Design a protein with these regions (language model features):
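Short hydrophobic segments within beta-strands
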Residues: 76, 105, 303, 393, ...
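Thiamine diphosphate
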Residues: 1-73, 228-459, 469, 535-536, ...
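Short glycine-rich or small-residue beta-strand-to-loop segments that form or flank ligand, phosphate
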Residues: 31-33, 74-78, 137, 338-340, ...
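Non-catalytic, alpha-helical, charged scaffold/linker segments
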Residues: 205-239
Length: 567
């Protein structure tokens, strides 16, 4: 499996393959980095949704259970997960979506770090999941608190029962004892994520009949277990390969699409729209770009946290991703639809997007107002940590949000999201920059991106007069050159680029040669070679001013100690 005894011996040490919280991309077969509790529940819901969408793209007409793309998503959650809001949000949506391919085990050991869960957690979790629309079962290893027996047969029977329920996700409450069978520690909070000590280890080994020496492993037994698993896996793989080969031969178009999606490649002739001079908000432009990309990229799908009309996240003609019984004349669609209705669940949306992305074949986006991105920040951070290409669409990006006032004005958000390592924050200045931004984002497969868009109409820059928007792909570019050797450089993003261009006209009229730079993405610009960066922001020009409708934090790097920021 890629892990050896030495890796277990280095558990929770710097640079090991066995950190305290397993990391995607570091350790083989780790399917997601959960870390914060509840994140994995949302990831699992996303994976189950992705499995349904992938089947719809590749094998929609196959009878249930016969497609090579039919599979189950299994998740394990604990008492802490059940208390986290993201798990509640995601579980609610999973019930609404009738995700019969999702089976979740709840390790009900009634212990968290501070002690017995009774001090903070008292609801009937089974009833809660029944209310969400899940199929619920209970397997009690404690036999009502009398004796402890890990009844694997009962657990397997529950799994088999879950598979017979195809119109509901399944929730299996598994009542256990934490730390069993460690003498004096089983059932206590002291064993939750803490070392049990030499005495505890010795007592456990005596209880289990092991030798009392460090890492006493019967290597012959290990080899036997590995061989047994390999043999079983080989047989299962042969059955699946036969089924897949039959599908592949019968579906050449689907096979070609699958090959492209597995390679994470875009069509060679991917086309994005261009926009004539005029006025258009970048959120509206984004909607137009999505509608243009839709027919070219069937793997691209997504939606909004109840703000689709404002976020412009619905592709033209895209049906809803919904069970048949929830579709209507207003919301036509089906289980293989393309438009996701996340509901008012920003945090779950972020985790679900990550789960869909981790599933590996499709690309997904989710939208909300930029100010509400605070509700999904942990999921965004995890996407950056995992280096996965989730796409976050955030509209209403500044004080220009309309009548809602300070609660909806995201003045600090640009700086705070730029502070997350590995996250691209892209704030295009007009419709054409938005188109190039979208194309560049879908070209990247190794990092997430936040696309930050305006509510209000912005001037669509006349590209016959100013530089091409293709410079967006490099993060920053000279949109308007000075009339002579520049004395001043104005740097603008988003809605403030047009302000910078107006300011240039006044400065030039006063005889001050002024260059205007559009910098929609600091992260992309920082990746450019030094020669290009120097060509855009020559070190000889120290009179620099950044203009952005947000706090100035982070701009000193670009304007320098002699520059200034209008914020």
């Amino acid at each position: 499996l890629g892990l050896e005894l030495s890796d277990l011996e280095s558990l929770r040490t710097w640079g090991s393959l066995t950190p305290g919280h397993p990391e995607y991309g570091l350790t083989k077969f780790v399917e997601t980095t959960t870390g914060p509790l509840g994140a994995g529940v949302a990831n699992a819901v996303g994976m189950a949704m992705a499995a349904r969408r992938e089947r719809g793209l590749l094998d929609p007409d196959a009878a249930p259970g016969t497609s090579p793309f039919d599979h189950y998503i299994y998740a394990i959650a604990g008492d802490g997960c059940m208390q986290e809001g993201i798990a509640s949000e995601a579980s609610s949506l999973a019930g609404t979506q009738e995700l019969g391919n999702l089976i979740m085990f709840y390790d009900d050991n009634r212990i968290t770090i501070e002690g017995d869960t009774a001090i903070a957690f008292s609801e009937n979790v089974e009833a809660r999941y029944e209310a969400y629309g899940w199929h619920v079962q209970h397997v009690d290893f404690t036999n009502g608190g009398t004796t402890y027996e890990e009844n694997v047969e009962a657990l397997m029977e529950a799994i088999d029962n879950a598979k017979t329920v195809t119109d509901k996700p399944s929730f299996i409450r598994l009542t256990t004892v934490i730390g069993w069978p460690i003498p004096k520690l089983a059932g206590l909070a002291q064993v939750h994520g803490a070392k049990i000590g030499t005495e505890g280890v010795s007592a456990l080994k005596e209880k289990l009949g092991f030798e009392d020496k460090p890492f006493a492993i019967d290597l012959e037994m290990v080899q036997q277990v590995r061989a047994a698993f390999a043999e079983r896996g080989k047989g299962l793989r042969e059955v699946w390969d036969e089924k897949f080969a039959a599908w592949h031969d019968a579906n050449p178009d689907g096979a070609a699409l699958l090959e492209r999606m597995l390679a994470h490649k875009l069509p060679d002739d991917l086309d994005i729209p261009t926009f004539e001079p005029g006025k258009m908000s970048t959120r509206k432009a984004s909607g137009a770009v999505l509608s243009a990309l839709g027919p070219q990229l069937p793997e691209l799908w997504g939606g909004s946290a109840d703000l689709a009309g404002s976020n412009n996240t619905t592709m033209k003609g895209a049906d809803s991703f919904l069970p048949e019984d929830r579709c209507s004349e207003k919301d036509p669609g089906g289980p293989y639809g393309r438009t996701i209705h996340f509901g008012v669940r920003e945090h779950a949306m972020g985790g679900i997007l990550n789960g869909i992305t981790l599933a590996g074949l499709t690309r997904c986006y989710g939208g909300t107002f930029f100010v509400f991105s605070d509700y999904m920040r942990p999921s965004v951070r995890l996407a950056a940590l995992m280096k996965i290409p989730s796409i976050f669409v955030w509209t209403h990006d500044s004080i220009g949000v309309g009548e809602d006032g300070p609660t909806h004005q995201p003045v600090e958000h640009l700086a705070s999201y730029r502070a997350i390592p590995g996250l691209d924050i892209v704030r295009p200045a007009d419709a054409n920059e938005t188109a190039v931004a979208w194309r560049t984002i879908v070209e990247h497969t190794d990092r997430p991106a936040g696309l930050v868009l305006s509510r209000q109409d912005l001037p669509t820059i006349d590209r016959s007069k100013y530089a091409s928007a293709e410079g967006v792909a490099r993060g920053a570019y000279v949109v308007c050159e000075a009339s002579a050797e520049p004395k001043v450089i104005l740097i603008g993003t988003g809605s403030e680029l047009s302000v910078a261009l107006e300011a240039r006209e006044k400065l030039e009229a006063d005889g001050i040669a002024t260059r205007v730079v559009s910098m929609p993405c600091q992260e992309w610009f920082d990746e450019q070679d030094e020669e290009y960066r120097e060509s855009v922001l020559p070190s000889s020009v120290t009179a620099r001013v950044s203009v952005e409708a947000g706090i100035a934090m982070g701009w000193a790097k670009y304007v320098g100690c002699k520059g200034a920021s209008v914020s």
